[in-house]
Amino acid sequence: MHIARSRGASTVMQAVLAFAFGMGWLGAGLAWLFISMHDYGGMPAPLAALALILFAAYLSVYPTLASAIAWRWCADRGPLRLALGLAGAWTLAELARGWVFTGFPWLALGYAQIDGPLTGLAPLAGVFALGGAAIGVASLCASALV
């Protein structure tokens, strides 16, 4: 996001990049669903692959919206505001992903931080806030490098 900001990308281009990120992240993380649907559920392989792609595309809407909201409201106000906006929008998007239409809270970013330096936040704020904090720290680090 910070690289796109430094190059003057539009909101639509930023959303496309965020959707591609979501498809890669969630598509790889949910690959086990193909095995469940195909090997154990008896679903034909092309249909199982299509179901996985469509499910990953649906779930990718959440990080896309978070990124687009942060981009639209915060990108022109400096890297600190962008980092805070992205952290807040990401946290709300992960909460929504875990709740809307009965939710699918798997692959929340906060779970990856269980043995990391942000672990102390987990009992205080929960896994979704931990993911938001990780996004905020990563965003600040990225802005320092760009």
Language model feature labels by segment:
Residues 1-146:
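Membrane-embedded alpha-helical bundles of multi-pass enzymes
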